[in-house]
């Protein structure tokens, strides 16, 4: 999937309008993680994607920086398209 940036007449990159904010509870409606209910960790407005806790987890290999260190594996949540989710409960302002 290619992330397309929308450019307006003044040649500036526009943000997409999103109805989901970080901290909201959402439900994934399509894809590998269908019917999973989780919280939004981060919203990426320029690429129309969100990072959801426990969804789209991939393993990243980290190389050793120094000679005496060992490499490691780190599990990270990667973004999914916002069109694959539906808002269940929004975060309450306190």
Swiss-Prot record:
GO MF, any single term: structural constituent of ribosome
Gene3D superfamilies, per database record: 2.30.30.30
Keywords: Chloroplast, Plastid, Ribonucleoprotein, Ribosomal protein, RNA-binding, rRNA-binding
Compartments where located: Plastid, Chloroplast
KW Ribonucleoprotein (keyword) present: yes
One biological process term in Gene Ontology: translation
Pfam family, one: KOW
GO cellular component: chloroplast; ribonucleoprotein complex; ribosome
Cited InterPro entries: KOW, Rib_uL2_dom2, Ribosomal_uL24, Ribosomal_uL24_CS, Ribosomal_uL24_KOW, Translation_prot_SH3-like_sf
Subunit (UniProt): Part of the 50S ribosomal subunit.
Function text: One of two assembly initiator proteins, it binds directly to the 5'-end of the 23S rRNA, where it nucleates assembly of the 50S subunit.
PANTHER family assigned to the protein according to its UniProt record, in alphabetical order: MITOCHONDRIAL RIBOSOMAL PROTEIN L24
Family: Belongs to the universal ribosomal protein uL24 family.
Name used for this protein in its record: Large ribosomal subunit protein uL24c
Gene name for this UniProt entry: rpl24
